[in-house]
Amino acid sequence: MSAAAPALVSIGDHGVLNAQLTPAQADVWIDRDMSWLDFNQRVLAEALDERTPLLERAKFLAIFSSNLDEFFMKRMAILQQGQTKEERSLLQTLRERLLPQLQQQADCYRNIIVPRLEEHGILLRRWDDLTPAQQEEAGLYFDANISPALTPLVIDPAHPFPFLSNLSSSLVFELRHPGHTEFMYARVKVPTVLKQWVPLEHDVPAGKKLFVPLYEVICGNASKLYNGMELGPATLVRLTRDAEVEMEEDPDEGLREQVQAQIRQRRYEPVIRLEFGPGADLAVRETLRERFKLTPLDLYDLPEDLDYTTLFELAFLPIPELRDAAWVPLVPPALDDEDPAAIFSIIQSGDILVHHPYESFDASVERFIRAAADDPQTVSIKMTAYRIGDDTPFVKSLIRAAEHGKQVACVMEIKARFDEERNLHWAAELERVGAHVTFGVSGLKTHGKTALVVRKEAGGLRSYVHIGTGNYHVKTARLYADFGLLTCNPLITRDVVNLFHYLTGHATAPQCSTLLVAPLTMRLRLLELIKREIENKRAGLPARIVAKMNQLEDLDMIQALCEASAAGVPIDLIIRGFCCLKPGVAGHTENIRVRSIIGRFLEHSRVFHFANGKENPLEGDFFIGSADWMFRNLSKRVEVVTPILVAGLKEKLWQFLDICLKDSRQAWVLGSDGTYKQLRPAPDQLGTQQTVMNLTLESVQ
């Protein structure tokens, strides 16, 4: 065991806490933020991977940047507020890890994406590369489609410094009157509401398409915005603001009003990052740095002046040979009945486990709520809503149900970051038709994915439930891989009824004998399940833990896993994102293996298996639910995890976990040195997601 001094650990949602690690804990601990950068490196690796279709590679460059934006808004914002030497050192270390990734991203775009797209007839050009005819065409496009949306500004004593919104890109110029040496700054915001890639047709060979970035077209026509003035070279700058605004709930003020005030305040939060394109004017850099009270560590000089999130626009060009083969989610065989109301009798005949996006979200979860809204036997519908999107069929179904006189209750999480305004809107729409809308439990976010339908049947009232690992969001249901359970088993439905009483009323704690509910029982129950595996191993009984989740960070859970490993319990962890546990450390985690699976779908499901003394995995315990093993999930959120009680559904989960553990195409393995290595199989080796697609096709044939 190392004799190192206790270390500071980056833990939790709201800052770098002075949590002291013991020497043993420090030996197996990986910093959360460093591990997150490793995760985003794995995303970038998909763009660098020759096996990935070309437009998908462009999409992964965009995902890499989008992820990084959120990382800065949430995590780097916290670190920048830190005052200790350790926190400042971590900022420097994170920056040093990030800079080579940014160079890799730029090299991939410039040396791979652009020339390879050209080979396939997609020409990406800069303004200076255009022919005179193309520049004239772009100028006409600018006059008709861009200029009316622009607001050219100057900064001088008569014009105050303009507001720069979060994640906005701006072009900054030196502006002079002809014959004068004095200059002022001019600023033009690049609008996000317009197409970010301008298509041109002049001098383009037949069968090819040519695009120019929007900011290049603006830059090439900027003189029209400042007619009669002299413009210097443009500096492209992109700004990121702090989004980690922690609201302390005021019991004397309504939560809705507090959230609305928080949304307004977020626009004006401190700037935490400035990104500059190549050749940025040094005076502009220094002016902005001083204006926003930043240090040199907060400025990033990028190798390429492109905002890579704009590549999402190109990634969906209709060129099938450059994209993943289209996947249309299939109707689960158990739900292959054209009568919408038949879903309730189908659930009565047995629990159903659906796996999205392989199996249809519309034909299962949406259908469940839609049928309940239209069914005259439905008495009530209750749902949690964390992220539900813009054009949500779920709210439409709830509105229709309320208009039909059914009792409708929705626990709307209006503190879901970046979805607050959307959720406030849907809350108002539901209240308008008389639905009961509550905002959950004071001080907690409601993150569980649960729906309850109560019907009047011959024998009395019967409850039906959906519990999932993913949001009630039709868009992400096509992009995220998640599980959901449909059941009318009273062992589960009774708990869900009590859970909603807790969420909508003032019960101190729901009576839940089957479900694991955070922050009330989940942490304790999970620790008990791990302890049981330790006891079984010591008693000579079969013991094993397989846990799949998005991230692992909670210190209690990591400590319990270390104790299980030390007792000889084999542990397999499938963790897509950051993992704060280092496997394979002698005396601590030598029986723990960690892998991460990255692919076309975001692996979002949380699945837990405990052998429970049984040699046959199908006789062990299985759970699915909404919670990762993070401090915030187990202590600061309402989360729901359900056991899977039916043998056939356990088999489906075990088959999936087994596929994940055997994957040598999409998997990365975490070593005892804290670094990930990508497995490299034969070229025709299938990964987890393609294997599940094939199995899903077989199941309906």
Locations of regions flagged by a protein language model:
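Hydrophobic alpha/beta core scaffold segments
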Residues: 570-574
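N-terminal localization/anchoring segments of enzymes in phospholipid and broader phosphate metabolism
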Residues: 1-545, 563-567, 579-601, 605-701
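Glycine/threonine-rich ATP-lid/beta-loop region of ATP-binding domains
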Residues: 555-558, 562
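Cofactor-pocket helix-loop regions in the catalytic cores of large enzyme subunits
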Residues: 550
